[in-house]
Amino acid sequence: MITTKEIIIASLNEALEKLEIKKPITLTEPKSYGDYSTNLALTLQKELGKPAIEIAKEIVNAIDLKKHKEIVKVEVANPGFINFWVSNSVLSDLVNSINSLEDHYGDMSKEGKGAVNIEFVSANPTGFLHIGHARNAAIGATLCNVLEKAGHRVVREYYVNDYGNQMNNLAASVFSRYQQIFNKDFPMPDDAYKGHDMTIFADAFFKKYGDKYRNVAYTEEVKKLFRDFGREIALENIKIDLGRFGVWFDLYTSETQQYEKDRVWPVIRRLKSTYEKDGATWLNTTKGGNDDKDRVIIKGNGESTYMCADIAYHEQKFVELHDPEKGKIIDIWGADHSGYVERIKFSFEDLGWRRDQIEILLFQLLRVVKNGKEIKMSKRLGTSLTLRELLDLVGKDAVRYFLIERSYNSKIDFDINKVQKSDETNPLFLIKYAHARCYQLLEKAQIKNPIASNLENDFAQKLTNELKEYPNLIDTMAKTYKVNLLPPYLLKLAGAFNSFYSNVRISGDPNEQSYLALVKATKIVLANAMKLMDLDIPNKM
């Protein structure tokens, strides 16, 4: 569906072509003076050497209003703005179209869209998820929904980092906590995980095995048993917490199985930019000038570094999309992994793929604040605040909404006091209340399929203009990965609806059916956008 904005931009481009001018066009939505406005003439005055007001008049005279009947009026305003008004029929048609499309409003064509693998969260299976993982999950899950809405086939993947020393630490931690069931003085290793989650895991081990492994020697066989058990119960708890958070995955891929299935070495052997030095195998990551030094991928003793499995895994993800031309893989990592970005991109390119087919988004840290003070420690775990504790404190929707309210590359403070409020100071409350009010209005009216025919009221037009921006929002987010644009859009839409509701008589008005159609369309778009964040959608509040 061609939007009104696209029609206006097309009319301006045609006018510029007549005047033999080339210039990008930006439209805004003014609070007054029309439905759309552009400062195009102001940006051209230096280039053309004449006043903006004169340029604006020339552009307006070149616009073919007979061709673009959706535009009912164009005016020039000082010092050189061009303002557009669109016909009432365009707005009514849009509202009726939204009500016809329902959940599919904003869907973009799948034609020409590549498949996308998004790997996110991917926390080590060594304990409960914490607040940093929560931000990763909120960003990743929302981006997956947005890209699907934009027409992409999306694969959600969790990489289980279950290979390496952190798993040995997990095994030793659970083993020690298990022994402490029988002997409270049993020592914990210095590098053990000391959170309460290890006690929970040890209790689960005791429930399954009883005292069978009491006072046993910590042999390789015993270590493997505790490592495997710890991995499984940690992953089980991770999945439980993600489920509560409204996050799910198509694939859980084990790092250990990358080696067991011999997926690593065939890929490593294909790297073009490796060399031998000091008995080790190095990857020439400085080759492109983006890394500060070359990296060892195989140590002198033949042991692989963590890079080997990661290099192979990234190619595996891409190949399994079965879309070598348009496919793309996206990783969402914490900002503390920034030094690893170029190494992975270089190795991906070194294997023969295009660099633009891998994207790595780095999200910044967050703090949880209550009563103006940072919550640094968990009351139960003695570690970072866990996702399950955060969900218990404020609920899924508040966490999902406020963790994507800011750009992923911005640090944020998650204010417990703010998100717990049920009043107009809480944007999530306002958004949900707007949806519930729409639902109640429609229930009371009992008109199943209202048809819009007259939306000349200023408040109705402003609200309709917000609705028509939704497809553009989907397109922008899909291209930029800026899912933080969703919350302010929802808040702006809710605000436009509340202004409409407060200033327009609906029941008994001659335009009642048109207004109810607009209410229905607003309800659809509010719900549609909230679903992208996996928020619960209330009909009553």
Curated annotation (Swiss-Prot):
Gene Ontology MF term list: arginine-tRNA ligase activity; ATP binding
Disulfide bond positions: none
EC number, UniProt record: 6.1.1.19
Main location: cytoplasm
CDD domains cross-referenced by the UniProt entry: ArgRS_core
Motif ('HIGH' region): 123-133
Protein location: Cytoplasm
InterPro entries: aa-tRNA-synth_I_CS, Arg-tRNA-ligase, Arg-tRNA-synth_N, Arg-tRNA-synth_N_sf, ArgRS_core, DALR_anticod-bd, Rossmann-like_a/b/a_fold, tRNAsynth_Ia_anticodon-bd
Keyword Acyltransferase: no
Record carries keyword DNA-binding: no
Keyword set, alphabetical order: Aminoacyl-tRNA synthetase, ATP-binding, Cytoplasm, Ligase, Nucleotide-binding, Protein biosynthesis
SMART domains for the chain: Arg_tRNA_synt_N (SM01016), DALR_1 (SM00836)
Any one of the GO CC terms: cytoplasm
Reaction catalysis annotation: tRNA(Arg) + L-arginine + ATP = L-arginyl-tRNA(Arg) + AMP + diphosphate
Top-level taxon in the UniProt lineage: Bacteria
Gene3D superfamilies given in the database record: Arginyl tRNA synthetase N-terminal domain, HUPs, Isoleucyl-tRNA Synthetase, Domain 1
GO process terms (BP): arginyl-tRNA aminoacylation
PANTHER family named in the record: ARGININE--TRNA LIGASE, CYTOPLASMIC, ARGINYL-TRNA SYNTHETASE
Entry similarity comment: Belongs to the class-I aminoacyl-tRNA synthetase family.
Quaternary data: Monomer.
Protein name per the record: Arginine--tRNA ligase
Organism: Metamycoplasma arthritidis (strain 158L3-1)
Name of the coding gene: argS
